[in-house]
Regions:
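Terminal targeting/leader modules
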Residues: 1-122
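Mixed-charge, glycine-accented linear interaction segment located at domain edges/termini
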Residues: 115-135
Length: 135
């Protein structure tokens, strides 16, 4: 049986801030359905944003409770773990993991990783709900 996968792209945005110690912060702008790609790629967008492709939401039976807790919440989310890294000579927020599981996101945060979230798009919710009902 094939593992359920849903291809997504991630947009990270650099936002200027007024602060004595730092001049900017990174934020997760969106997670959207995308075509399946074989490799991670990044394209600069206007407004200091970067569009990352090549990610998937993978569903694992062992995470079913975490998906259920997320989808049954008033504001279900897609979680993205990201790190500040250099990509092709530019320092940027590079996504590493996308998940729908509260538990997986919490484990990453407990491990010291940066995890942000955005509201789950309707297409992703419609994809995961039947799987969740079966598991």
């Amino acid at each position: 049986m094939e593992k359920p996968l849903f291809a997504v792209s991630v947009v990270m945005r650099r936002v200027p801030i007024v602060n004595r110690w730092v001049s900017e912060k990174w934020e997760l702008a969106s997670v959207e359905p995308d075509a399946v790609t074989d490799a991670i790629s990044c394209t600069a967008l206007p407004d200091d944003a970067w569009h990352w492709r090549g990610f998937t939401l993978d569903l694992h039976p062992s995470e079913a409770e975490g998906y259920y807790l997320n989808l049954s919440a008033p504001d279900p989310r897609v979680f993205v773990m990201w790190r500040l890294e250099e990509w092709q000579g530019v320092e940027t927020a590079r996504p590493w993991v996308t998940t729908l599981s509260y538990h997986e996101a919490a484990r990453m945060m407990d491990g010291g990783e940066t995890v942000d979230s955005v509201q789950i798009p309707d297409a992703i919710r419609a994809w995961v709900e039947p799987w969740l009902a079966e598991n």
